[in-house]
């Protein structure tokens, strides 16, 4: 690659474009109010070729073929023809993109769009024509056409020494056990036991908060542990020009993990906020004095310093600077007034006067009540003068003061006193204690807040919210629903129409004084029922414990299949296509229930509902084996008795010879009886009135429904399916998945065969004129040999043959 020559530019004082706001860097989550977002000042960390911040003419360079002393005459030349229509741009963090060379678009606008899409701050970057960041930068005020015409290749590099040092796009997340619990940096709630943490940036979060974790890894959190990173940051800070250079070096010196004090980290800097805290003569030491009066004053929460943790460590919380205390007190009072004002808006919907409210006097170490702060949503720390822990030392100015306007000051004054980088990170970095203090863990906040004393933990005057009465999951309280009227009763309970956020069906179960084991089994079944969601299954909405055990399900606006077949007048004669569709939907719903290990145990036409549109089928009253099981005591042992509707009961259920006769095949048998009802419009065994006789004969396999009552247009494949569903041996019955496939394979004829006899004309009657004409045509079509056509016997035989052929064609014989 040939060396590129650069030239100075005189048009570099162009103001920042208002259409290119500076985006917030993801890896710096606490810089919402930093000075980086200011458009009227250039960041001291910005390169001379920063995409959004052009500098003076002596710091911008332009690409040119030769270094010329004067720039006169350049406007008279024609715009150069560019060689490349697309330019490859290499971005930080090993990213790359392509930029289209558009006429009139400057390089600053084009490259800034790429950086903003990736949430990279353009002020912290500079652009080179080489992969070496030490090479001279290009002038971004030039158009992309001019740059493309002078580039030896179609590549540009965007470098940022600062981002490469303090940020990374790769977290080192590991699973951690937090004992004691730590606060999540996303939701600020405690992490109980198991959680996740990045080993680089120390970002902690719950598993449920993983989607809100920052994309970039902020390596500044590891500054107190990494000496190499501190050296690199000192090198970057040395490149900062102007009054902000000393501020950056002071902050970095206080964060450095070295035992000695850095020469740059002196409190005698020119910054007014830094000089307000003096190390010499600014700290009062309060030794511990054990006395009743001292103990009373220490345990009182109203005192300025309630309690010291150790008698060997000095109390460094008292700062002998009254002006600074008053200054911070004004800030805290203003913040408290703002908080009370916002609370008044939330409660009344209008702005209430807060001047008459009592503003509490903040003591050292008291945090603004109600303020929650984490690394994603930072707030101003209200600790006025540093850490309140007796084992830590405040080596840096308080957060929220540098780079922010104080009361009575203009924003311009505060904006010129700090660098954008320092203001963005100052209140997010932990402090490092000196050698005299015991070691402590790094806190994610700027200050390590002192834990409260026992007398401070509870506030007797604070109103506590009333506790909500406890009830189990999906349990509905008696005052939350209304019973309207009775709908009907069945084998296991009575159904009512009711109101529970809409019309519902409330079924009171026939259960009296359930035992603890039965109640536990009932809750387990409810836990399964609440997970059922299917188009052909009634929606389970909850259960009721008192005054009677009941379940609440979806209300079906329609009638049961039993009423459509046997009760309503005139009776509904379903077409064969509608019958197949109903049976398909029942098979779909039952196949879904069996996939959830739910046995219906009482499938019948009374529990199959047709909606008002007559096209949707719903299955109800499923599951609840505990309620549908009846136990009797015989010889000191419990024996299970069959319960349910005997007409739909499978033979093995009637016999009760197995420990658990209820299987998916027993539901298939009940489905076969439902098929018989809808195909014959009759109940099975209607000619037998003795209930015990039906139980005995069906249980032994001597009795089956009368197949002769089934309608004659039933396809043979459906008849075969019906026979398989009501087989005596349950192992020979299909499952509902197979039943569904066989129903889908049934093909109905497009034309329906007529069941009435045709009007056949007798041969000895007089034919009509039309019959005579057609008979003559048939005679003319027949082939008669010439030798035999002359004889009358042959002619009569031919006519008789034609008549037979005529009637065979029209189906009359």
From Swiss-Prot:
Provide the top EC class. transferase
Zinc fingers typed Phorbol-ester/DAG-type, residue spans: 170-217
Q: Name one GO molecular function term.
A: zinc ion binding
Q: Where is this region: Disordered?
A: 1-79, 258-315, 338-358, 383-472
Aminoacyl-tRNA synthetase in keyword set: no
Listed GO biological process terms:
cell fate specification; defense response to Gram-positive bacterium; MAPK cascade; meiotic cell cycle; nematode larval development; oogenesis; Ras protein signal transduction; reproductive process
Mutating residue 754 to F has which effect?
In n2520 and n2523; no effect
Q: What are its E.C. numbers?
A: 2.7.11.1
Q: Which cofactor does it need?
A: Zn(2+)
InterPro entries, A to Z: C1-like_sf, Kinase-like_dom_sf, PE/DAG-bd, Prot_kinase_dom, Protein_kinase_ATP_BS, RBD_dom, Ser-Thr/Tyr_kinase_cat_dom, Ser/Thr_kinase_AS
Residues that coordinate or bind Zn(2+) 2: 184, 187, 206, 209
One Gene Ontology CC term in the entry? cytoplasm
Q: Where is the composition biased (Basic and acidic residues)?
A: 338-348, 453-462
Q: What does the cofactor section's free text say about binding?
A: Binds 2 Zn(2+) ions per subunit.
Active site at which residues? 602 (proton acceptor)
Output the SUPFAM superfamilies linked to this UniProt entry. Answer: Cysteine-rich domain (SSF57889), Protein kinase-like (PK-like) (SSF56112), Ubiquitin-like (SSF54236)
Keyword field contains Secreted: no
Q: Indicate the segments forming the Protein kinase domain, all copies.
A: 481-748
A Pfam family reported for this protein in Swiss-Prot or TrEMBL: RBD
Which UniProt keywords are given for this protein, alphabetically ordered?
ATP-binding, Developmental protein, Differentiation, Kinase, Meiosis, Metal-binding, Nucleotide-binding, Oogenesis, Serine/threonine-protein kinase, Transferase, Zinc, Zinc-finger
Task: Specify residue ranges for compositional bias: Low complexity.
Answer: 9-23, 386-399
| Family of the protein in this entry | Belongs to the protein kinase superfamily. TKL Ser/Thr protein kinase family. RAF subfamily.
Q: What else is known?
A: Gld-1 binds to the 3'-UTR of lin-45 mRNA and is able to protect nonsense-containing lin-45 mRNA from nonsense mediated decay (NMD).
According to its UniProt entry, the function of this protein is described as: Protein kinase that participates in the induction of vulva and has roles in fertility and viability. Acts downstream of the Ras protein let-60. Required for progression of developing oocytes through the pachytene stage. Plays a role in responses to M.nematophilum-mediated bacterial infection by promoting tail swelling and preventing constipation. Positively regulates lifespan upstream of mek-2 and mpk-1.
Protein name, please? Raf homolog serine/threonine-protein kinase
Q: What is the lineage of its organism?
A: Eukaryota, Metazoa, Ecdysozoa, Nematoda, Chromadorea
């Amino acid at each position: 690659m040939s060396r590129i020559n650069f030239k100075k530019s005189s048009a570099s004082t162009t103001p920042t474009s208002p259409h290119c706001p500076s985006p917030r860097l993801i890896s710096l989550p606490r810089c919402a109010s930093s000075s980086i977002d200011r458009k009227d000042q250039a960041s001291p960390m910005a390169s001379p070729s920063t995409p959004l911040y052009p500098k003076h003419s002596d710091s911008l360079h332009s690409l040119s073929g030769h270094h010329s002393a004067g720039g006169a005459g350049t406007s008279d030349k024609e715009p150069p023809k560019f060689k490349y229509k697309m330019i490859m741009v290499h971005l930080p963090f090993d990213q790359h993109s392509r930029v289209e060379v558009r006429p009139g678009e400057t390089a600053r606008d084009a490259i800034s769009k790429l950086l903003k899409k990736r949430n990279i701050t353009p002020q912290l970057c500079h652009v080179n024509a080489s992969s070496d960041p030490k090479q001279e930068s290009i002038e971004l005020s030039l158009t992309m056409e001019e740059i493309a015409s002078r580039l030896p290749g179609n590549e540009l590099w965007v470098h940022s020494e600062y981002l490469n040092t303090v940020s990374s796009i790769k977290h080192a997340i590991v699973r951690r056990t937090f004992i004691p619990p730590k606060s999540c940096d996303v939701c600020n709630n405690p992490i109980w036991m198991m959680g996740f943490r990045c080993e680089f940036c120390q970002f902690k979060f719950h598993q449920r908060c993983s989607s809100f974790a920052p994309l970039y890894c902020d390596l500044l959190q590891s500054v107190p542990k990494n000496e190499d990173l501190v050296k690199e940051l000192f090198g970057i800070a040395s490149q900062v020009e102007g009054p902000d250079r000393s501020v950056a070096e002071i902050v970095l010196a206080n964060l450095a993990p070295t035992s000695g004090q850095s020469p740059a980290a002196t409190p005698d800097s020119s910054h007014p906020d830094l000089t307000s805290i003096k190390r010499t003569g600014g700290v009062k030491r309060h030794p511990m004095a054990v006395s009743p009066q001292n103990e009373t004053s220490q345990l009182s929460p109203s005192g300025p310093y309630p309690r010291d943790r150790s008698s060997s460590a000095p109390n460094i919380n008292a700062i002998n600077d009254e002006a600074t205390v008053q200054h911070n007190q004004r800030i805290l009072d203003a913040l408290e007034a703002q908080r009370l004002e916002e609370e008044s808006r939330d409660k009344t919907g209008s702005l209430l006067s807060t001047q008459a409210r009592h503003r509490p006097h903040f003591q050292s170490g008291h945090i603004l009540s109600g303020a929650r702060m984490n690394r994603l949503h930072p707030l101003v720390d209200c600790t006025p003068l540093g850490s309140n822990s007796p084992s830590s030392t405040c080596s840096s100015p308080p957060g929220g003061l540098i780079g922010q306007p104080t009361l009575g000051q203009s924003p311009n004054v505060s904006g010129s006193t700090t660098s954008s980088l320092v203001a963005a990170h100052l209140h997010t970095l932990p402090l490092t204690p000196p050698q005299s203090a015991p070691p402590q863990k790094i806190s994610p906040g700027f200050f390590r807040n002192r834990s409260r004393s026992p007398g401070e933990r509870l506030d007797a005057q604070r109103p506590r919210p009333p506790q909500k009465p406890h009830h189990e999951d999906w349990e509905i309280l008696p005052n939350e629903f209304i019973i309207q009227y009775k709908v009907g009763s069945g084998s296991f309970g009575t159904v009512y129409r009711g109101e529970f956020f809409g019309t519902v069906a409330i079924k009171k179960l026939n259960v009296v004084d359930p035992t603890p084991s039965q109640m536990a089994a009932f809750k387990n079944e409810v836990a399964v029922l609440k997970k059922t969601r299917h188009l052909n299954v009634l929606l389970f909405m909850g259960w009721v414990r008192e005054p009677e055990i009941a379940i609440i399900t979806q209300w079906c606006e329609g009638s049961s299949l039993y009423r459509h077949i046997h009760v309503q007048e005139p009776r509904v004669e379903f077409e064969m296509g509608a019958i197949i569709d109903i049976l398909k939907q029942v098979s779909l719903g039952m196949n879904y229930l069996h996939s959830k290990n739910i046995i219906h145990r009482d499938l019948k036409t009374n529990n199959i509902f047709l909606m008002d549109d007559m096209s949707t089928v719903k299955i109800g009253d499923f599951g609840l084996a505990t309620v549908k099981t009846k136990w009797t005591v015989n010889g000191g042992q419990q024996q299970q008795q069959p319960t349910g509707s005997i007409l739909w009961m499978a033979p093995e259920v009637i016999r009760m010879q197995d420990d658990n006769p209820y299987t998916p095949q027993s539901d298939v048998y009940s489905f076969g009886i439902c098929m018989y009802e809808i195909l014959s419009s009759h109940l099975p065994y209607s000619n037998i009135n003795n209930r015990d006789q039906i139980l005995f004969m069906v249980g032994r396999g001597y009795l089956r429904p009368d197949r002769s009552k089934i309608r004659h247009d039933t396809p043979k494949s459906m008849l075969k399916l019906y026979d398989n569903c009501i087989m005596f041996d349950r192992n020979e019955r299909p499952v509902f998945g197979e039943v569904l496939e066989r129903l889908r394979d049934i093909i109905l004829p497009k034309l329906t065969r007529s069941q009435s006899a045709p009007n056949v004309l007798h041969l000895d009657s007089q034919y009509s004129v039309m019959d005579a004409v057609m008979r003559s045509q048939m005679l003319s079509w027949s082939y008669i040999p010439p030798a035999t056509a002359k004889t009358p016997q042959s002619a009569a035989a031919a006519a008789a043959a034609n008549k037979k052929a005529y009637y065979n064609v029209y189906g009359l014989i």
